[in-house]
């Protein structure tokens, strides 16, 4: 059957197409995109902030032993990470709601200030309790930074430039995952662990200055609102009502209970303990209550409207982000263990050894972003990303104590190449699906999926690694004290193991790391499945400012 011919000149267009074009043209006409040097400064500032966020999450890892020694707080170790995570996850949807109601630039600035305040509290902490409070405050501020940065890019840049700019931001900021432990170790060894937090202040100040001197356009609401973008607090009562604070409290309860269950399960409490079971059950009930409440208040007020979360492209993108983040963090946390424990290199050199994956990721993030902006299609890159990362993770899972340099360089590069292909595709899918005023909500959900999914897979990887290490020690070094080896850590076990038992312990460590990458392969396989749900959609390109409707065929 032939396609219908386009209308001749002078004939009216079909009503549906006309309304779509009018909406897009109206949005474009109201948007005041920035270009040139100003756009470059905006990209630099939000990249600084995203880098800062990932640096803060990774830099504390090498400082924790010294912190626990100073505060005599070994029992509080779990809270140094979970306090940040709990606050960050619980506030993600609320942060997205704030970006839809209040001015984009100053809301982002407020979150940055809260994050910096948390860093000051951590750096100045005189007790373990003060440090935990500071981590929670930093998590509150961090809940609005990555999603705010992505929202700023999607508002400030023309549609055809957004893929490459998002790729640049996400690709470069991921370097912080490698730099964090290196800087943390350097500060702890040569200065003080407090600089692990104070380093956030100058970087954040540079980003804040760049944003304050540049005018960033706000999103345009498609309907008349009780709130004014120019005067966001003109009606405080209406603002509070639209924030859906009841929904926030219920969602925060869900996120807190599930996060605590994952944090404590297998370490503080056994998985079968009443505490862990109670937390999972309570989190499940809170989630059900949240869904019912959101349906009750309706999309106009709901913190996570059904019209946003219910779209297949949105929830598939969020799940893609969660599994993608899980795979990425397995690489980031367990490759250094392989290099330091198995290859016996220093923390600094292990960071250098991870450069092939990082370079492949950064290069391909920019290349794929440019290609998506030119062609308008993001789904092939998401699918290609899943395939390449799965292959790379599978190859890395074959690492042995004597794996050659050529192999560990090339295998990392393949995985990094794949990560760079797909890391920005969920954000692009969400932006192409939702209206401009709903974009911040969708991005917040994706960032929540990224944070929550990454945390979940790190917990799973920790269980897999611990189990694999104990099994390997009993098989390859049955005479060693397993508890002493695990207590000594990945860099200290050589001091407590005899020369005869050392090869067996190294072999056990190598196999335990390999097992964690089976988990990365599984996570990446899930991204391949959910990528199809992100939709075959052609986004606007430089020569075509109209998005092509999705085809489900």
UniProtKB/Swiss-Prot annotation:
Sites where a glycan is attached: 21, 543
Residue numbers spanned by region Disordered: 1-29
Any one Pfam family match given in the protein's UniProt record, by short name: MFS_1
Residues spanning the membrane: 41-61, 77-96, 101-121, 136-156, 164-184, 196-216, 245-265, 273-293, 319-339, 352-372, 376-396, 440-460, 516-536
Biotech use: Compactin (also known as mevastatin or ML-236B) and the intermediary metabolites Ml-236C and ML-236A are inhibitors of HMG-CoA reductase involved in cholesterogenesis. Their hypocholesterolemic activity might be useful for lowering cholesterol levels in the blood and reduce artherosclerosis and coronary heart disease.
Annotated family: Belongs to the major facilitator superfamily. TCR/Tet family.
Protein name as catalogued: Efflux pump mlcE
Gene field: mlcE
């Amino acid at each position: 059957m032939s396609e219908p011919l386009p209308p001749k000149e002078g004939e009216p267009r079909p009503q549906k197409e006309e309304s779509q074009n009018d909406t897009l043209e109206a949005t474009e006409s109201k948007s005041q995109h920035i270009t040139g040097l100003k756009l470059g400064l905006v990209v630099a500032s939000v990249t600084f902030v995203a880098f800062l966020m990932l640096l803060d999450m990774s830099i504390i890892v090498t400082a924790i032993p010294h912190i626990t020694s100073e505060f005599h707080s070994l029992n509080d170790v779990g809270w140094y990470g979970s306090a940040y995570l709990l606050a960050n996850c619980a506030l993600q949807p609320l942060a997205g709601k704030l970006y839809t109601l209040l001015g984009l630039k100053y809301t982002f600035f407020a979150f940055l200030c809260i994050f910096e305040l948390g860093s000051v509290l951590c750096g100045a902490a005189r007790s373990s309790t003060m440090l935990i409070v500071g981590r929670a405050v930093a998590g509150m501020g961090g809940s609005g930074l990555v999603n705010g940065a992505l929202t700023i890019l999607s508002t400030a840049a023309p549609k055809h430039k957004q893929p490459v700019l998002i790729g640049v931001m996400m690709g470069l900021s991921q370097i912080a995952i490698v730099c964090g432990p290196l800087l943390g170790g350097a500060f702890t060894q040569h200065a003080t662990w407090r600089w692990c937090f104070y380093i956030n202040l100058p970087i954040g100040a540079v980003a804040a200055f760049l944003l304050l001197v540049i005018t960033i356009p706000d999103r345009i609401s498609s309907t008349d609102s009780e709130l004014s973008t120019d005067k966001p607090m003109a009606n405080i009562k209406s603002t509070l009502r639209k924030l859906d604070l009841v929904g926030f409290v219920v969602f925060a309860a869900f996120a807190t209970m599930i996060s605590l269950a994952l944090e404590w399960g297998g370490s503080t409490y056994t998985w079968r303990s009443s505490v862990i079971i109670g937390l999972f059950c309570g989190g499940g009930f809170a989630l059900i209550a949240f869904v019912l409440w959101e349906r009750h208040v309706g999309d106009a007020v709901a913190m996570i409207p059904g019209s946003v979360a219910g779209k297949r492209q949105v929830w598939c993108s969020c799940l893609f982000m969660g599994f993608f983040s899980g795979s990425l963090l397995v690489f980031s946390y367990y490759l250094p263990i392989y290099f330091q424990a198995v290859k016996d290199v220093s923390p600094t050199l292990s960071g250098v050894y991870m450069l092939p994956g990082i370079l492949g990721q950064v290069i391909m993030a920019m290349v794929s972003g440019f290609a998506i902006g030119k062609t308008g299609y993001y789904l092939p890159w998401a699918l290609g990303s899943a395939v390449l990362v799965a292959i790379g993770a599978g190859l890395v899972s074959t690492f042995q104590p004597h794996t050659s340099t050529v192999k560990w360089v090339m295998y990392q590069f393949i995985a990094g190449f794949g990560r760079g292909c797909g890391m920005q595709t969920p954000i692009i899918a969400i932006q192409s699906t939702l209206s401009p005023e709903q974009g911040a909500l969708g991005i917040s959900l994706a960032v929540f999926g990224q944070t929550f999914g990454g945390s979940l897979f790190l917990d799973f990887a920790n269980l897999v690694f611990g189990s694999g290490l104990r099994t390997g020690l009993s098989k390859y070094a049955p005479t060693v004290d397993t508890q002493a080896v695990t207590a000594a850590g990945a860099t200290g076990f050589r001091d407590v193991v005899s020369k005869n038992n050392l090869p067996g312990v190294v072999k056990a460590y190598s196999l335990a790391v390999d097992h964690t990458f089976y988990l990365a392969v599984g996570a990446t396989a899930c991204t391949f499945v959910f990528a199809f749900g992100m939709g075959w959609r052609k986004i606007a390109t430089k020569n075509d400012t109209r998005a092509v409707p999705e085809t489900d065929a």
